[in-house]
């Protein structure tokens, strides 16, 4: 059940105060997901004309049965959405190969959409755990796209996503520095919060596949860095913002990588420090949140007072009303450091993220699909960023509602959305419905930032599966 708004706000205030009193260093998690989901679609009717109309646009026609097109985990909840002006009582799950009905059940009507004049219902077929390829059909409505049920769906998705990072990396250039740094930040955060998900894939002290790929990205950054100044350069022109990103990411990687190779980690830390000192000498304006991120990472990695002082000075001027990307990373780093922190500053900044997470949760209560926004109103990047915030805060406060929302985001991205589009595609495996190259380039599996964000979602889901 979703928390009532009034009770949530009281609970949030108590929680934030407890985090301040504890020094902002504690994080942990345990969840079991619940069913939540609705759908909102419009049925398009074709009208016959007595005279041919040559100037027209073909309307988009969307399926009335929505499923997770990338597939369901065998032991997880399995939900489909059904919409229509008139709905049948039952649904049937059909084996795609044999055409045998393997499961039947009653649909549950959730609401009536006044705009589309359609009922919205869901079918819960969680009891079906046998691996295979299926589709869902209903009388008078039709059938869904095919979907699979597998024991290792999430494991497969994680492997494919990490492998796709390697393919994407081949086409990177120095123009991509900021996006590369953002991706590395998300991936390392995922490892910091949900490392057990990746470590279980590692044998004989080899690097986790995720860290191995992140190292390759970091190596590319080091090759782009000017060895003399420590800055990112475009010819003779310094790239100040890119240099600030470099400072933060190299220090962050150094902190994580020291347990695998202390010598390489130290080299990254020295490169980060060199970039920071270069920026200190420049009379230029750089976003405070970005400098704050770099300072928090260098402080956590070195413990030096100069970085502690910079964190306090920069943090004091940060907005308490916005959730900015670099500020978010810096806040989570500062909250997790084992070194001395300014408890008041830490609590105030962490409160910004907690408040944003609660805003997303409240918006999700009004959304038919149980997430904080819609692909019709926001970009895929914005949807994934909201999910990244929820994934992080679920680790901080262990909230059953947040875990449910992340499941909803995962389903939404894979086809349980207004347009039935699967936004997850992998190189050489593009098989679904987005044809425009501009749109395809942003898909998970083809875009490194969005792929990193989706990996974060998967790591949160898989961590809870380990606990069950």
Whereabouts are the PLM-identified features?
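Hydrophobic core
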Residues: 15-21
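Aromatic (Trp/Tyr) and acidic
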Residues: 16, 66-143, 151-152, 167-181, ...
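N-terminal low-complexity, Pro/Thr/Ser-rich intrinsically disordered segments
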Residues: 35-61
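Carboxylate/His-rich catalytic cores and anion/metal-binding grooves
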Residues: 205-228
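Selected transmembrane alpha-helices and immediately adjacent juxtamembrane segments
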Residues: 276-283
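Short coil/linker segments at helix-helix boundaries
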Residues: 189-213, 252-268
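Bacterial N-terminal signal peptides that target proteins for export
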Residues: 2-12
């Amino acid at each position: 059940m979703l928390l009532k708004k009034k009770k949530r706000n009281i609970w949030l205030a108590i929680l934030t105060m407890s985090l301040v009193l504890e020094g902002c260093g504690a994080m942990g998690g345990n969840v079991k997901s619940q069913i939540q989901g609705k759908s909102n679609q419009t049925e398009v009717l074709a009208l016959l004309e007595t005279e041919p109309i040559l100037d027209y646009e073909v309307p988009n026609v969307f399926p009335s049965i929505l499923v997770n097109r990338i597939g369901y985990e065998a032991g997880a909840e399995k939900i489909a959405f059904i919409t229509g002006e008139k709905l049948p009582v039952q649904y049937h799950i059909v084996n795609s190969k044999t055409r045998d009905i393997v499961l039947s059940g009653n649909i549950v009507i959730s609401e009536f959409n006044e705009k589309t004049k359609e009922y919205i219902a869901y079918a819960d077929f969680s009891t079906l755990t046998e691996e295979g390829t299926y589709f869902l059909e209903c009388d008078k409505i039709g059938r869904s796209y095919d979907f699979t049920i597998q024991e290792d769906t999430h494991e497969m998705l994680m492997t494919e996503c990490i492998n796709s990072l390697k393919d994407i990396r081949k086409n990177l250039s120095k123009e991509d520095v900021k996006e590369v740094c953002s991706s590395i930040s998300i991936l390392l955060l995922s490892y910091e919060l949900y490392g057990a998900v990746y470590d279980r894939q590692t044998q004989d002290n080899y690097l986790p596949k995720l860290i191995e790929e992140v190292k390759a990205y970091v190596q590319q950054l080091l090759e782009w860095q000017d060895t003399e100044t420590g800055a990112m350069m475009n010819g003779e022109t310094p790239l100040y913002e890119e240099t600030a990103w470099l400072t933060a990411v190299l220090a962050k990687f150094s902190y994580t990588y020291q347990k695998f190779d202390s010598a390489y980690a130290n080299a990254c830390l020295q490169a980060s420090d060199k970039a920071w000192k270069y920026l200190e000498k420049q009379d230029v304006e750089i976003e405070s949140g970005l400098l704050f991120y770099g300072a928090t990472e260098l402080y956590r990695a070195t413990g030096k007072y100069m970085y502690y002082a910079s964190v306090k000075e920069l943090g004091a001027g940060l907005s308490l009303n916005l959730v900015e990307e670099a500020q978010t990373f810096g806040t989570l780093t500062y909250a997790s450091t084992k070194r001395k922190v300014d408890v008041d500053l830490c609590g105030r900044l962490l409160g910004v993220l907690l408040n944003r997470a609660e805003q997303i949760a409240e918006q999700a209560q009004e959304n038919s699909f149980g997430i904080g926004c819609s692909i019709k109103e926001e970009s895929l990047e914005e949807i994934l960023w909201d999910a990244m915030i929820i994934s992080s805060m679920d680790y901080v406060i262990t909230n059953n509602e947040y875990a449910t929302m992340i499941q909803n985001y995962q389903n939404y991205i894979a086809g349980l959305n207004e347009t039935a589009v699967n936004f997850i595609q992998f190189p050489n495996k593009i098989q679904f419905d987005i044809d425009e190259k501009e749109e395809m380039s942003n898909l998970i599996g083809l875009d490194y930032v969005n792929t990193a964000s989706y990996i974060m979602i998967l790591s949160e889901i898989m961590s809870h599966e380990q606990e069950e």
